[in-house]
Amino acid sequence: MSVVKIPLVKKKSLRQNLIENGKLKEFMRTHKYNLGSKYIREAATLVSEQPLQNYLDTEYFGTIGIGTPAQDFTVIFDTGSSNLWVPSIYCSSEACTNHNRFNPQDSSTYEATSETLSITYGTGSMTGILGYDTVQVGGISDTNQIFGLSETEPGSFLYYAPFDGILGLAYPSISSSGATPVFDNIWDQGLVSQDLFSVYLSSNEESGSVVIFGDIDSSYYSGSLNWVPVSVEGYWQITVDSITMNGESIACSDGCQAIVDTGTSLLAGPTTAISNIQSYIGASEDSSGEVVISCSSIDSLPDIVFTINGVQYPVPPSAYILQSNGICSSGFEGMDISTSSGDLWILGDVFIRQYFTVFDRGNNQIGLAPVA
């Protein structure tokens, strides 16, 4: 049994790379930016909707190795999806040529299957094949892990993506093609001592962020963990009691559903509610479609408070206003994701940077505590 610590590195996001290459406007024009379609899934189909635009602002990445000897890949550890996939040598899309590509012929432990994988994005689909191989993650060997080898990847914009692939950490029920997720396979093999993993995201430093499989490291948080039951086992979905600013309800007055998603960088919610919040904090759209705010307002704005399972989780303006190159932008994003349990909110990295998060599969609960 070992504790598996995977360091995450904070790098420039896809959005920042697009801006620096003068490609953001073209991207926004050609990719109707629908963050929500990652979460809209027909349970009956095996096609999962997961637009890559969701990963536009993601900044935290980890390295895994696949095969024997290991071939290294930079991936997003994403609690909002469940598949592992990386580019393969069978992919000649422009995006693949600029990234590490898995070569099955170079691995002595690779096992092919005849199964295919298709993950639909907002603008096309990532199609590929499923294979089995050993995945090296945080110093342990996850053997016989099923994963996707991409053959086509949508959109040349992925050429600029700072990651090769995605490692999904949500429940098996939302895995495309019914593929066993990495954490499930690791737990089933008895490679970690507890059926849980935890995440710490550092605010500023490039290093320091970490995903820990099978353990809770109390040095990352202060006080004690508060536990919240998972309301629907698919995403890491929980019930939020209320969302307030200055003691006034600004959204979710009758309770709402939220998912805790490391693969989404912002705080997202229904467009009407979010536009109320944007006007409340004085944020507005500039000519390029960015929602900007005066940097001087960071000192005067109130916390936004999420009450979850009776406990208040304040997120201060220094967290929900993002500063980059002297420009301040809102960390709130509107999207409409209606589910049978109502409209979904997404507590992304803006929230997780404030709260050390434990994803407890064994007890179907999430633990939250302020970061140390």
Curated annotation (Swiss-Prot):
Residues 1-42 form a propeptide. InterPro entries: Aspartic_peptidase_A1, Aspartic_peptidase_AS, Aspartic_peptidase_N, Pepsin_A, PEPTIDASE_A1, Peptidase_aspartic_dom_sf. The gene is PGA. It catalyses: Preferential cleavage: hydrophobic, preferably aromatic, residues in P1 and P1' positions. Cleaves 1-Phe-|-Val-2, 4-Gln-|-His-5, 13-Glu-|-Ala-14, 14-Ala-|-Leu-15, 15-Leu-|-Tyr-16, 16-Tyr-|-Leu-17, 23-Gly-|-Phe-24, 24-Phe-|-Phe-25 and 25-Phe-|-Tyr-26 bonds in the B chain of insulin. It comes from Bos taurus (Bovine). This is Pepsin A. Residues 60-369 form the Peptidase A1 domain. Belongs to the peptidase A1 family. GO terms for biological process: digestion; proteolysis. Its main location: secreted. It is found in: Secreted. Its EC number is 3.4.23.1. Disulfide bonds join C91-C96, C252-C256, C295-C328. The active site is at D78, D261. The keyword Hydrolase applies. GO terms for cellular component: extracellular region. The keyword Disulfide bond applies. Keywords: Aspartyl protease, Digestion, Disulfide bond, Hydrolase, Phosphoprotein, Protease, Secreted, Zymogen. Shows particularly broad specificity; although bonds involving phenylalanine and leucine are preferred, many others are also cleaved to some extent.
